Amino acid sequence: MTTKLIKHGSKAREQMLEGIDILADAVKVTLGPKGRNVLIEQSFGAPKITKDGVTVAKSIELKDKIKNAGAQLLKSAATKAAEVAGDGTTTATVLARALAREGNKLVAAGYNPMDLKRGMDLAVNAVVEEIKRSSKKINSQEEIAQVGTISSNGDKEIGEKIAKAMEEVGKEGVITVEEAKNFSFDVEVVKGMMFDRGYLSPYFVTNSEKMVAELENPFILLFEKKLSNLQPMLPILEAVVQSQRPLLIIAEDVEGEALATLVVNRLRGGLKVAAVKAPGFGDRRKAMMEDIAILTKGELITEDLGMKLENVNIKNLGTAKRVTISKENTVIVDGNGDKKNIEDRVLQIKSQIAETTSDYDKEKLQERLAKLSGGVAVLKVGGATEVEVKERKDRVEDALAATRAAVEEGVVAGGGVTLLHASQTLTKLKVENKDQQAGIEIVIEALKDPLKQIVKNAGENGGVVVGKLLEHNDKNYGFNAQDMQYVDMIKAGIIDPAKVVRTALQDAASVASLIITTETLIVDEPSDKEEPMPMRGGMGGMGGMGGMDF
């Protein structure tokens, strides 16, 4: 058993804060329109250049175990903000560091950490309510483009393309991002569908950075029942291996031995495969699988028609240009279905909508209609070099997520202004004791930090700008760090999604509260010996089965 290193009290927190400082200092330089890039060495290929806070945070691991514990906690704030709202990762990092630093000082001075936390929670809840009150719904293409532009670090073209994509497929439509084969940046609408089922095992993931399974030009097997044994499927699996193309299995469920066998062969490289549960329930599930079959020019393998798995061949499988599977969703892009058959299916669903008297059935039929006829907008990102394309693609993905957040909860004045002005509402909060009041003061001071950092990255004095803005009662009055002018942020189009600002603050406060209420830290003691290289396993398989292991 590994021996443990145990640290207590302020010494433990101070070392954790050193790790937090290291990570925050690397991330904070990316904040605002004049934020800088960060170059990250990769284990293979060219270095990665990014201005995305969460990408920088994810790349950092510290040798010192205690400092690393602090850095990992701070990283979790950035990661959570990215997962929930798609942006605000650097803001969350800056806020968490400020809250944790000030909180630790007060704990060291004898304040009760639990009361400090209660005061911070009161303040954060009040600011969240203020953000919700201040938010303004966005409707126009211009406003959508503005959000996309700001979230992509001032790239107008990205903002305009996202607005165009949303116009093509609707604000709730499916939009994906992929690398183009040329220099251009285009929006293309293709046949496609998204449904709310993710991969059945994380071992199917092909892109570990984004935790998604990406299948290029896959075959798609649609099976109505549960799969618990792969024996009947051996002929079709062998045919897929021979074709050297990936396979997506959509079934009622894939369980037990069948799932384990697929995972083993995926890991050993014999079979590029992923499995997901079919969407819907009961009769609706069968109808949705038939929709997918028509979209991909495949067949639903169903015992009602006397079809058996052992008799399935390549011709019965559907195909698509690309399938992307996340933990929650599956997106089928550019299925090879016949246009006439898809149109006939759409007309059939429309007639069912007209005939049904149930509001619930009507809603579900309309969902199916939207999935089948809406299509998928693909943002194709090009560039001169691979490094440039990847960096721009990251920004497009962030901007798309932030734009969706803006459509969902509205927008507020950007550039750190909303948090700064919201801090002024906290002076009226009533608390039970001075320690809780101190917790509120921590939040008031920390809310100034994102704006200070934006201004500092633009080469000006953040404290001076904050002082000048606080003299004004107008909550939209702020500092345009791009043009170095004081403006009405909403009129100038400098806006942030309310969800992004809210999530950044809540995630930062959550992490900071954990740090200031931590009294003991237990980590693995560093080993003097170098760890031996792991043994590499051989490639398992059975003769005549193309390296597959069944």
Swiss-Prot record:
Annotated catalysed reactions: ATP + H2O + a folded polypeptide = ADP + phosphate + an unfolded polypeptide
Keywords: ATP-binding, Chaperone, Cytoplasm, Isomerase, Nucleotide-binding
GO cellular component, one term: cytoplasm
Record's subunit section: Forms a cylinder of 14 subunits composed of two heptameric rings stacked back-to-back. Interacts with the co-chaperonin GroES.
Keyword Chaperone recorded: yes
Its job: Together with its co-chaperonin GroES, plays an essential role in assisting protein folding. The GroEL-GroES system forms a nano-cage that allows encapsulation of the non-native substrate proteins and provides a physical environment optimized to promote and accelerate protein folding.
Coiled coil: none
Gene coding for it: groEL
EC number of the protein: 5.6.1.7
Resulting phenotype, residue 432 to Q: In strain: Breinl
Protein known as: Chaperonin GroEL
UniProt subcellular location: Cytoplasm
Domain of life: Bacteria
SUPFAM superfamilies: GroEL apical domain-like, GroEL equatorial domain-like, GroEL-intermediate domain like
Binding site for ATP: 30-33, 51, 87-91, 415, 496
Annotated family: Belongs to the chaperonin (HSP60) family.
GO MF annotations, alphabetized: ATP binding; ATP-dependent protein folding chaperone; isomerase activity; unfolded protein binding
InterPro entries recorded: Chaperonin_Cpn60_CS, Cpn60/GroEL, Cpn60/GroEL/TCP-1, GroEL-like_apical_dom_sf, GROEL-like_equatorial_sf, TCP-1-like_intermed_sf
GO BP terms, alphabetized: protein refolding
Catalytic EC class: isomerase
Entry annotated with the keyword Cytoplasm: yes
